[in-house]
Structure formats: structure tokens, C-alpha cells
Amino acid sequence: MNTFRSTIICFFLCVFSSYAQSIQDIIDAVDLDNLSLTLREFTGEITTVVDENTVTITNRQQANNELAGDYLVQKLEELDNITINDQQFDSNGRNIIATQLGKTNPNNIYIICAHYDSVADYCADDNATGTAAVLEAARILSTQCLDNTIVYALWDEEETGLNGSSFYAAQAAGNGDNILGVLNLDMMGYDGDAPGTAGDNQFDIDIRDFAGSIDMKDDIVAVLNSYTFDLSVIVVNPGTFSSDHSSFWANDYSAVLLGESWETNDQTPFYHSSGDRFSTIDLPYFHELTKLTTAYMATVGGLVNVDNGVSQTVTTLTANQASASYQWINCDTSSSISGATSQSYIPSVSGNYAVEITSGTCTELSECIVFDTLGLDDFLASEIKVFPNPVKTNLNIEITNNTESIALDLFDVSGKLVLQKSITNEVISLNMKNLPRGVYFLKVSSSEKTGTYKIVKE
Ligand SMILES: [Zn+2]
């Protein structure tokens, strides 16, 4: 979203909440443009930049996918709150594992995963789709506090025998890792039913009766039924062993495969060929499946509801979340603002500001808010009168031909807001009788104009 213009347009109270606070907000944050861009970059339809070099990732076959691995590491490194394990498991094999530690139960682990290797050029459906969906879940959920740990895993060497996931699952079992569910995404972009129409939006969940895999399917279906998705589920039991979830079944972990419907014979006709390209992907279908998988991970992850939205008036930024601790940040310099640790903050200059909100063990960052009142015109002297000055009791403000709501903010000399009022008529009085003597600044703001007046209280 473009917060720059909205700062000017929304005036008295704007709430910025592009960051998610509820499961529905998480669903709404899944961005098809972002998914499409990742797909096109990761299948070499367009160039991308990896380690400052412009590159084309056309092929991701096992012996030829270092660049693809580097791309994934770079994408994940852009995110906060995760640690990356670049896991070399044999001479050419390399899993990319990103972990977001749970705030309450860090030992409870849920995995969302996909293989990123391929058998031919492009291979958009198999499995750039699953890879892009994992990256999108990471992009959204890494901004959130979650009770449980989420592992975003991208496997290598699936196509040569599930080698990457086998290595990881065996190691996890050996360590006694408490993995409670593994959501494996493999081929989730093709929906070709009813040629010439939009398809039937059926997708498969493949399960077998290993550990809690059937319960896990029920949980996914519960999420499917709790929110609105343009999807129709086909449960496949006994499900296929032919993807990475079966590495976890082999180690007695709960796991499912989710993807397009092989069960109804509606898989891509370009399977394992270089005809499997971006142009064959049903983007709305892929979008819906990514919303579902991201919503499921947010649900089992235990989304903690810290409101990291920020409200804004012409003078003040206020964190929506009450009863927390706060640190305001200057986004332009990426630095904390000394002393700015209240729920509200009054910037002294235009700029981009964010707030870090800590509630219990949970810290979330708001987005950067553009704070810019300098774009407003000043009131002309003929349009406004502020009198008497110096003032003892009532300060009168007269605005000629006023027809809109106007904000009055009175600050003391230290910049602290001491009085706030709005007027919709032409004349108003501010009672300053009970304020200490001294110098004050009155800020008067309409949607188009602003003025600041030095007032002396006697
Ligand atoms: Zn695959």
C-alpha cells in the first residue's frame, strides 16, 4: 500500500493495519502479485538479482541448482525473526531451512515445506508453486508473534529420491524434535477441469494413518470451513508416498501432502517436462491454496494478537495496542528514537516512523508510517485569528468561512500535548485557565492547511 498519499488524505484518525492481526488478516495479506513475481523469477521467465548479479534461474536440477538455493537464502534473509540453516547434506544436496522460534512453546514445531529442485527447465508447477507458497507464508508470518515454532523448509533432491527431506526427518527424529505437523506442498498451481472455464478448484490432501496425520487433515479442513476460500477438498487416504511428507511418515511424524488433484486426474499435463511453465499456472487457484496453507500455519502456530497498527493525527502517532511497552523508530535512519517510549509519539520533523511494541514475550514492529504535514499550506493571516495573546483564561480561535472539522492541538514548550479539540464552526475558545504559565504552541490543522501559533499564558 502506499501510505504516503493516505497520510495527507486521511486526517483526524487513520488506522494503518496492513500488517495482520487475525487469521482473516493473514489470509488477506497473501499477495498474488508477490506470488507471481516469485514464480516468474524462480522459473527463469524473468531475470532476478542474486548476490548483486543479474541472473536467470531457468534450471533447478539437483546438480545445477546452487543459484536457486542462493536465491532462496537471499529471500529469507530479508525477513525478520527467523534464522537460516543452509544445510548441506551431500555433495550436491542443500536444504534451505528457516526457523521462526515460538514465543510460548518453542519446542512445539510445525513445518511448512516444499522441494525446490526440478527435473527439467522451468518446472513452474513442480515445484516453484510450493516453493513460492512457503516463501509467502514466511514473508507474512515472520512479522507476527506466534506461540509455536514454525520451520519453513525448502528441500533439495526430492526428484532424485526424497534425499533432502529424508536427511532432515531422520536427523530430527534422532534429536527427538517435537514436530507436531508437516505440511508438504508439491504441485499446487494447476486446475484444468472443464476446459474453457475456471476449473473446479478441487485439491488433494494425501494422508495415511501415521502419527496424527488424519487429525492434521481435519485441522486443515476446519480452517477451510472457517473462512471463505474458493476451494473444494478431496481427501486421499491412503495417500501417495511420492513426495517429501513420506520422509516424515517414515519417522512417525504427522504429515500431509497438499496440492492439485491427482485423485480426480486433474494434474498438470506438462508434468516433468519443460512445458511446465508459468503460463500454465492457474493463478487464482494457486492464490486460494496459498491463502489456505498460510492460514493453517498461522492457526497451528498460535497467532498472538498484538495489534501493531498505528493511528495518526496531524500531530501525533499512536500505537493501537494499549498496555504494552513501546520504542519508536526512525525508519529513515533505522534507529531507535531516544526517549520515545510512550504509546504516542509526536514527531518534530516529517519522516518515516515505526513503533516496536512489546507485550509479554512478544515483540512486533508496525509498518513505517509516513508522517508529513509539511505538504499542507499555511493559513493566511486573513483566514485565522488567535487571541488574546498573551492569554489568561480563554484563548479564542476564529476561522473565516470554516465548513469543515479542524484540529486544535496545544503543546507545552517541551512538545507535550496538553489540550486537544476539534471545531466545526468558525469560533471556539480553549480554556487555558488551569495550565501553568509559560510558552505554548497551538497547532491548527484542516485537511488542506495548517498553522502553528506561539501563545504566552500569563
Ligand atoms: Zn514435485
Task: Give the location of each predicted region.
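Bacterial Sec-dependent N-terminal signal peptides
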Residues: 1-23, 376, 416, 441, ...
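N-terminal capping segment at the start of a domain
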Residues: 21-63, 117, 266-277
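A non-catalytic alpha/beta surface segment that caps or lines the substrate-entry region
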Residues: 37, 44-101
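Acidic/histidine-rich catalytic neighborhood of metal-dependent amide-processing enzymes
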Residues: 118-212
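Active-site-adjacent substrate-binding region
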Residues: 193-305
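A short beta-strand segment in extracellular, disulfide-stabilized domains
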Residues: 312-321, 394-398
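C-terminal outer-membrane/trafficking sorting elements
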Residues: 325-333, 341, 345, 349-352, ...
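Short, compositionally biased serine/threonine- and acidic-rich segments at solvent-exposed termini, linkers
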Residues: 352, 359-374
